Amino acid sequence: VPENVDLSNLLSVRALSRRLNQTLPKLDAIVLNAGLGGWTGINWPKAIWGVMTDLVHEVSWPSFKIAPAGMVTDPQTALGDDKEPRLGAVFCANVFGHYMLAHNVMPLLRHPDQLHGPGRVIWVSSLEATVKYLDVDDIQGLRTLAPYESSKALSDILALTADLPSTAPWVKSFYSVDEQPGPQEETEQEPPHPNMFLTHPGICGTGILPLSWPLFYSMLAAFWLARLLGSPWHTISTYAGACAPVWLALSAQAVLDDAEAPYRRNGGGRVKWGSSCNRLGHDQPVCTEVDGWGYGGVVGPAVLDGDRCRRRKRGAVDLTAEEKLQYEDLGRKCWQGMEELRIQWDELLDEAEAQVGSKA
C-alpha cells in the first residue's frame, strides 16, 4: 500500500513512522531516495561552453547550476521562532528527513526475523557529492552556494563511517529503539542493528532540474553522447539507475560481503556502490571513487582492475593515509552533529504535539 510523506515536514515524517510501526511486522530494507536540488537557474554561457568543449565532464560533474544560500523549510511547529531553529530546506529533504524516518522505524529494521540477516539502511547519494562543499560547522548547508552537493556529501560520510569505532557512540544512539507504546515482547538479547549502505543512480534523465521539453531532450542527447564517449555513469533511464540500490536491497548478505571483501582485505571499509552501464546500456553496480575515501577506503591506488580502468573525475588523486584519517574524523563530527540535531528536534516535536493535545 503506497504511503505519502513530506520529507521537509518532520511532523509528516513522524506520522508516517507511526503508521509503519503500527501496520508492518518488519522492514528488510529502507531505501532513502528523495532529492531536492535547490537550484534556481543555470549559467547558460558557462553551460553551453562547458558542454561544447568538455562534454563528458560537464554532464557528469556540472559546474553551471545556480543555487542560493539560506533556503529553509516552512516552520515545522507552532512553537514560534524563539523556540524553533531554522532548518535547511535541501538538508531536510535530502538527509535529515530520511535520518529521522530511519531512526523512527528502527523497531522494524531491527526485527529478529529478517530474510537476509539484519535490516538495511540504504542511502542514495549522487555522483556530484563532493566533500569540499561540506562544512561541519554548517552541516545544514545554509551558507553554501552548493547545498545539494553538500547534502549528498553528508550522506556519503554518514554511510561510509557508520561502522568505525570513532563514530560508534552516536551510531549506537541512532540505531537505538525508542520506547514503543503498548506491551513489549521480552527478548533474551538485543536484536542486531541494521547494516548501512551507500549507493547512487549514476546520471539519469529526471526532472530534478526543471527544463522545458526541448531542453530536456537536448540534455538526454548529451547524456547519450557522453555514454558513447566512454562515460560509465550515464545510465540515463531511471530503470538502469535503480540497478545498484535494488542490488543492495535484495541481494543476500553473503553476496554483499563478498563484493566488499577485496576492499576490506586491503585496509578499506564501506563502498559507495554506483549504477554504471557500458555503451550498450548493460548496467551493473560498481565501486565509486569518493573524495577523501577513495575506492572503498583503501589507501593508495585502486585494488581492482575494474576500478583502475574506469574513468575518474578530473583532478582525482589516490587516497592518502592522512586524507583518510581526516575523513574519519569528519565522520565522527557529522554523526555527533546529526544525533544532537535529531534529539533536539525530537524534543521540539514532542513539545509541539503536547501543546496541540492540551488545546484539543
Label for each model-derived stretch:
Residues V1-N4, A15, R19, T23-D28, ...:
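NAD(P)H-dependent oxidoreductase Rossmann-fold/reductase module
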Residues V1-S125:
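Fungal eukaryote-biased detector of long internal structured cores
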